[in-house]
Design a protein with these regions (language model features):
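Proteolytic maturation boundary segments
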Residues: 42-87, 274-313
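M16/MPP (pitrilysin/insulinase) zinc-metallopeptidase core fold and M16-derived inactive scaffolds
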Residues: 91, 96-168, 234-236, 346-361
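His/Glu-based metal-binding/catalytic segments typifying zinc-dependent metallopeptidases
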Residues: 98-100, 294-356
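Structural beta-strand/beta-sheet cores of well-ordered domains, especially the beta-sheet scaffolds
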Residues: 75, 83, 95-97, 114, ...
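Pocket-edge structural micro-motifs
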Residues: 78-81, 87-89, 101, 154-156, ...
């Protein structure tokens, strides 16, 4: 966009005045010719049409550099719209872009249980291509990432939804390409009635698949009992077939407005990238705006204070499945979480773990 100030015209008039002083014999006709040229110059400038589609990058602040025990540096930023960004540069064959949305099944109404997972599916069904975001059709993300030799996926959990793209960077512009795609998925989805109706089938099929998995059944029963979650859904994350069939475009749009906004997202980059260059690309593309107000639901978790045992008999099981759950430390308690991981590894996750040894005996 051009800035039409008076400095250029003032300089032009100055040239006319100098010419008039040096040529006092010039007649009125010559003076009028100069004035006409001035008018012509001004008219030509006014015909320039500014490009209103140019998008200004979101500003950002570098909040620090964290250093892990292995020497890995993590460059931390916060965009002016509240979105957090963490960049971990390292030599790697793959560069991975993850965006975590701070929402999951614990943010759903019970009669809409499963809508977080449904919205995860919708993210791959195309974007509108408005407001300067990239236009994507159904399956375009999978196709384009596949053409680059990469992979893409997403997952929904109790408290977060994660979108990931991982590629080998053969070309310099590949990183910006995947950032543009993911930012469009987060901010510019096509959520028409037709698109929502088409996704009912795949999502309900997935629910039916999970209902036949003994380990999934056991895990859901354990979680619901551990935190006294009152729900009509057998699967806390996937929801029920009835819930999903009742999801329409209005419910999807409302859920997005209340949960998918910059201040509720964190983007993490790992791989062979320059942090200074990467943050500029991210700030230019993740330029979403926060709603003036939100109506977020938070599940009231009430951990049990005594041991609960549930036995499930299923004709779908081919072996015995056991699940043990307990209320662990908060997410930001790094020390205790590391200790819990070590205990889990010792007890469960090795071939020669204590549990396996006991079962063998």
């Amino acid at each position: 966009m051009y800035n039409y100030n008076n400095s250029y015209l003032h300089g032009f008039r100055g040239n006319i005045e100098t010419s008039q002083v040096n040529n006092v014999t010039n007649n009125k006709t010559e003076s009028n010719d100069q004035e006409n040229k001035t008018v012509t110059q001004q008219q030509e400038l006014q015909q320039v049409t500014p490009d209103f589609n140019v998008k200004v990058p979101v500003g950002y602040t570098k909040t620090g550099v964290e250093k892990l025990s292995n020497g890995q540096e993590i460059h931390c930023y916060k965009l002016n719209n509240g979105q957090k960004v963490m960049i971990a540069p390292k030599e790697s064959a793959m560069t991975t872009l993850n965006t975590y949305v701070n929402t999951g099944s614990m943010n759903e109404k019970d009669d809409e249980r499963g809508i977080s997972h449904f919205c995860e599916h919708m993210a791959f069904n195309g974007t509108k291509g408005s407001d300067g975001y990239e236009k994507l059709g159904i399956g375009d993300v999978f196709r384009k990432v596949g053409d680059m030799g990469g992979r893409t996926n997403a997952s929904t959990n109790f408290a977060e939804t994660n979108y990931t793209i991982s590629i080998p960077q053969f070309n310099k512009n590949d990183f910006e390409t995947i950032v543009k795609m993911q930012s469009s998925m987060m901010n510019n989805l096509e959520m028409s009635d037709n698109m929502v109706d088409k996704e009912h089938g795949p999502v309900t099929s997935e629910i039916n698949m999970y209902s036949d998995m003994p380990d999934n059944i056991a895990a859901n029963v354990a979680i619901k009992n551990l935190y006294n979650i009152q729900t009509t859904s057998d699967d806390v994350v996937a929801g029920t077939v009835d819930n999903i069939m009742n999801v329409d475009s209005k419910k999807v749009i409302d859920y997005y407005k209340n949960n998918y906004y910059p201040a509720n997202m964190t983007t993490v980059v790992t791989g062979d990238v320059n942090p200074d260059e990467a943050i500029e690309i991210i700030a230019k593309n993740f330029r979403g705006e926060n709603p003036s107000k939100t109506d977020r639901r938070m599940e009231a978790l009430k951990p049990i204070d005594k041991t609960v045992r549930k036995d499930i008999i299923s004709n779908k099981a081919v072996a015995t499945t056991g699940v043990i759950c307990f209320n662990g430390p908060e997410n930001n308690n790094t020390k205790d979480n590391i200790a819990i991981e070590l205990v889990n590894e010792y007890l469960f996750n090795r071939l020669n773990s204590k549990i396996n040894q006991s079962l063998d005996e």
